[in-house]
Amino acid sequence: MSTAAILPFPPLPALAWDADEPVPSAGTLMPTLADGVLLERVARGDADAFTVLYRRFERPVFGMLLRLAGGRRALAEEWLQEAFTRVWLGAGTHDPSRGEVRPWIYKIALNTARSEMARKRFRMPHVSLDEAGLDLPDERAGEKRVAAHLDEARRATAVAEALQRLPDFMREVIVLRCSRELSFAEIAEVTGAPQGTLKSRFHRAVASLREALGPEAGKAR
């Protein structure tokens, strides 16, 4: 059992975009340490190393979880907490010879989402503009700017809803490939599926999204 497994889990810092005070970035904390070195320190119970590792991955991992949660921020934050609890407790189990730290963390986060969705018999809801994580401009903004922002928000919501209608195995590969920009080799590490299968799923998912979105497909980013 790793040392970290018997130590109390350190409190996660506030999400960087929610914190009242500026939060030191990974670049100002242990800037020269690679992910693998940080994880080794985490395995020995180093809470500072854990904070740096968390800061490096919180945004992209949260973004992935938010999309898998259908835009439900509170749920994605809950999954993020659980995922990094597992990172802390399982730091000593990572085998550098079998893969890098990044896909290992994504795998933990994805498995967290999968298990939580299965446990709660999760069903994707209708995605509102707010749930899609879209900030509307201030009422005092110009009329054209507001209209343009709303148009963009509606397109993003249409994409989010189309994404949630995909089967889980298609949605996962789309989110990991397009939103998080992982290679198919990394996605294979995360999901456990062969690269050829993942590429097939990806192309089928893209075709399904284009069909579902119709004219919006060319506008959506």
Q: Where are the regions a protein language model picked out?
A:
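Arg/Lys-rich amphipathic alpha helix in sigma70-family domain 2
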Residues: 89-96, 107-128, 152
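Short, charged helix-capping/linker segments at alpha-helix termini
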Residues: 28, 44-51, 62-82, 195, ...
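Residues in the helix-turn-helix
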Residues: 75, 197, 204, 208
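Intrinsic, short, N-terminal disordered tails of RNA polymerase sigma-factor systems
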Residues: 1-44, 52-56, 121-176, 182-195, ...
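Structural recognition of an alpha-helix C-terminal capping motif at a helix-to-coil junction
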Residues: 78-85, 99-111
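Sigma70-family region 2
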Residues: 43-44, 67-71, 82-100, 119-121
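Amphipathic, Lys/Arg- and hydrophobic-enriched alpha-helical face
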Residues: 54-73, 89-90, 163, 212-215
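Hydrophobic/aromatic residues within well-ordered alpha-helical segments
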Residues: 53-57, 61, 79, 109, ...
